[in-house]
From Swiss-Prot:
Protein name: Protein C10
Family of the protein in this entry: Belongs to the UPF0456 family.
The keyword Amino-acid biosynthesis is annotated on this UniProt entry: no
Main location: cytoplasm
Source organism (scientific name): Xenopus tropicalis
Subcellular location: Cytoplasm
């Protein structure tokens, strides 16, 4: 097993350089888009409908589990805490690297359903 794939104790903070974060993020996205990952997420989406509560109960845990399976290969604990630590690490690199920012945005789209724009009732367009 390479040093990249050693598991870190859950209490250990994992720090990866930018390129490894990009690699891990790419693997997470690939896992979510794989036939198996897509099927798991689609089933959760169908069972959730447009109910945000059900999205949190069904879709979010499925997506987190898929991430855990990848992130443990990068030394993160295979639990929700490992996913949160990775999310914080990604966030710290978003402003430094536009590719990481774009990949992070794509990752978030797996968790959050598209929200409709709120109506702008009572607001009129400025007159010229």
């Amino acid at each position: 097993m390479s040093s990249l794939q050693r598991s870190a104790p859950a209490s250990q903070n994992v720090s990866l350089p930018l390129e490894q974060v990009k690699e891990a993020l790419g693997e997470v996205l690939n896992a979510l888009q794989s036939p198996t990952g897509s099927a798991r997420l689609e089933e959760a989406r169908e069972n959730s409908g447009n109910d945000l509560g059900k999205v949190l109960q069904l879709l979010l845990p499925a997506a987190v589990q898929i991430q855990q399976e990848v992130l443990q290969n990068y030394g993160f604990s295979p639990d929700g805490e490992g996913v949160l630590r990775f999310a914080r690490l990604v966030k710290s690199y978003e402003s430094q690297d536009p590719e990481i920012a774009a990949m992070s945005s794509k990752l978030k789209s797996f968790f959050l359903p598209p929200l409709p724009l709120p109506p702008h009732a009572g607001l009129s367009a400025p007159s010229s």
